[in-house]
Amino acid sequence: MKDKIYKAYKFRIYPTKIQIDFLNKQFGAVRFIYNYFLNQRDTQFKETGKSDSYYAQTKALKSMKGQEEFKWLKEINSQTCQQALQCLDAAYLKFFRKETAFPRFKKKKNYQSFCVPQHFKILEKGIIIPKLKSQIKCKFHREIIGEVKSLTISKTLTRKYFVSILVEQKNE
């Protein structure tokens, strides 16, 4: 039997207008990176029968940030960008294992989210995420039990914002 289990706690967050702008930039960047590299993989696969790996795309993302037209990507947390590439890689692997259909492009009008794997803080009345200096208010209605692993910030179609906190707990 497994000695560890993962559990997620979901809470509503209440960002200010400035924080909403910041979060929307994060959502947009994650969507852009996913779609840009999905298009790149698709084009390569059609031309050569092969496509870049996650690691090759991570290197390409790093060099993209140095280009003038993609300079705005420096405002985005690098680990959040890498998480978008990991999601794309997982979608590709599932497609080739015939578990799902071919990965689709992400749309702005759909549910949006991004993952923050490190360098965040959970405070008594909110959270702090990288590149955003202010605290985002959060209503914690349950106690968080376990070792916190990552945060996922999401936005619904009704423009409500949530944080999902992934924790690792001992299996008893």
Feature map (PLM): residue ranges:
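Nucleic-acid substrate recognition interfaces
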Residues: M1-E172
